[in-house]
Amino acid sequence: ITGNLIRKFGHSKIMYAGVFLFLITVLTSFFDQNFTNYLIALIFLGFGWNFLFISGTSLLVLSYRENEKFKAQGFNDLIVYSIQATASLSAGVFLTLTSWKTMNLVCIIFLVLIILSTLRADLKERK
């Protein structure tokens, strides 16, 4: 489904939609930590992650020559999953040292970086 959305609307719009879904996740988690909000946040997190991961991965292979695509995607997957594993393993420590609200605020920093890099790529593409 995400691939069809990318073909219809383009990589950037799906990435912005993914950031928006992540922002809903952060806001839902930030203000109340009850089970319902947690469940809603997980649903938006799943869709946001899917939109960002699929659009980013499909955009990555477009920037390489045909004979480099598989190596680039393999290296990208290694980096993404290594960072994901590190974040998962360190989340408990980070939560113990800070708070749930702080963790959500840190997510906003990464969302802003994604928006800025996507905007930059859009501006370069238009030139």
Stretch-by-stretch model annotation:
Residues 1-11, 95:
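Helix-to-loop junctions at the C-terminal end of transmembrane segments
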Residues 10, 31-33:
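Helix-breaking motifs and short loop linkers at transmembrane-helix boundaries and internal kinks
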Residues 13-27, 108:
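Structural signature of the two symmetry-related core transmembrane helices
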Residues 25, 36-44:
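Paired small-residue
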Residues 51-64:
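Intracellular juxtamembrane helix-capping segments at the cytosolic ends
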Residues 93-111:
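A membrane-interface helix-boundary motif in multi-pass transporters
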